[in-house]
Amino acid sequence: MKSPFWSWNGRIAELKETAKATGVDLEAEIRLLEERLARLRKETYENLTPWQRVQLARAPGRPTTLDVLEKAFQDFIELHGDRAFADDPAIVGGLAYLEGEKVVVVGHQKGRDTKENLQRNFGMPHPEGYRKAMRLMDLADRFGYPFLTFVDTPGAYPGVSAEERGQAWVIAQSIQRMSRLRVPAVTVILGEGGSGGALAIAVANRVLILENAWYSVISPESCAAILWRDAKEAPKAAEALKLTAKDLLQLKVVDAIVPEPEGGAHKDPDRAIRNIKEALLKALEELKGLSPEALYEDRYRRFRSLGAFAEP
């Protein structure tokens, strides 16, 4: 997403260079421009369109699951493989500590560059990825550890190989398995939350979403291609899908919005990760003390209430 502020930044930099070269005091003019730029940035980022937020959710440099695990957790030990076919690098998971508490973590993992994106299939899991996630769900249940997931995927991989290995069936199994957890479950949507590929690891007691992330049954481009026969209508589709954090909170699809640094999480990943950690700890505190049966019932009620409405 191209910054609309480059001309302002350029003008401020030019004035600073002029002041340095000539010795003329331009401090007042520079301060005035910086104040105007700050107001403009605030107004712009508070009023982004849904399509602009989708673009921010896809921005290179946003925190990935492994970034969060490295900076917000301690002693992460990654576990590999589904014990049936292969290890899927599009989903990572394992054991870790969060402020001294043992947890099990699972998340989609995109690459940080083209080479890694190809290796991780752009964060689009195969069936073995979801089987690995279910293996970790069983581990969390067996030892009574909270189960934390991080969502960032355009969707489950739709290729022939994945379909041959039962992609739809495995996603359904993962949804069912997570819904039956007897431990606290919290999901954070980091960037993209595309369709069943996201929902498969998002059936949690608390679902949190970053300010510029999106979560929907379909991507705007695919929706536009179906409804308007033209993927270029994606901005219109993004508006209609109600996929932004603000819309999702209003619809009670998510429980809380995690604030991002101005300009998006990719502008200051460390600060974004600190915000994620704080939100996770708060969500876990809310669930602390609930019995396994109460956690199950809480999750059941949460998802059964989605889409409920009253006749006028």
Curated annotation (Swiss-Prot):
Presence of the UniProt keyword Kinase in the record: no
Example of a GO MF term: carboxyl- or carbamoyltransferase activity
Major localization class: cytoplasm
Cellular component GO terms, alphabetical: acetyl-CoA carboxylase complex
Signal sequence, start to end: none
Domain CoA carboxyltransferase C-terminal positions: 32-286
Gene Ontology BP, a term: malonyl-CoA biosynthetic process
Pfam families: ACCA
Biological role stated in the UniProt entry: Component of the acetyl coenzyme A carboxylase (ACC) complex. First, biotin carboxylase catalyzes the carboxylation of biotin on its carrier protein (BCCP) and then the CO(2) group is transferred by the carboxyltransferase to acetyl-CoA to form malonyl-CoA.
Oligomeric form and interacting partners: Acetyl-CoA carboxylase is a heterohexamer composed of biotin carboxyl carrier protein (AccB), biotin carboxylase (AccC) and two subunits each of ACCase subunit alpha (AccA) and ACCase subunit beta (AccD).
UniProt-recorded name of the protein: Acetyl-coenzyme A carboxylase carboxyl transferase subunit alpha
Species whose genome carries this gene: Thermus thermophilus (strain ATCC BAA-163 / DSM 7039 / HB27)
Taxonomic lineage from the root: Bacteria, Thermotogati, Deinococcota, Deinococci, Thermales
